[in-house]
Regions:
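Terminal leader/tail segments of proteins
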Residues: 1-103
Length: 103
């Protein structure tokens, strides 16, 4: 199932916008299509290697990171958070500020 089809199941009457994450803060020239941003109403999701890894809500200004997975995905997350106006310095800081502890 394509990512857009998956999101349409959860947001059936919403306009879904999908775009590539382009590096502004990272030294890379491109993420080569491996990082995508999906915007649906007030929700913004980061997809890295076809996995939802982070999201934030524009209204509540709350961001959450699911997991940092790999070094490359961490770079995608840092870029996404920075472009969205959030602090993103180190893996430790991101995990502390944006990941929920699992009991």
């Amino acid at each position: 199932m394509e990512i857009k089809e998956l999101f349409q199941k959860f947001y059936p009457n919403s306009n879904i916008s999908i775009m590539e994450l382009c590096p502004c803060y990272d030294s890379a020239q491109s993420f080569y299509g491996k990082a995508k941003v999906i915007e649906i109403e007030n929700d913004v999701f980061l997809i890295s290697y076809n996995t939802i890894v982070a999201f934030y809500n524009r209204e509540t200004k709350i961001a959450e990171v699911v997991d940092t997975y790999s070094a490359t995905t961490l770079r995608h997350i840092k870029e996404f958070l920075r472009q969205s106006g959030f602090k993103a310095e180190t893996k430790k800081q991101i995990e502390r500020d944006y990941m929920k502890e699992v009991a």
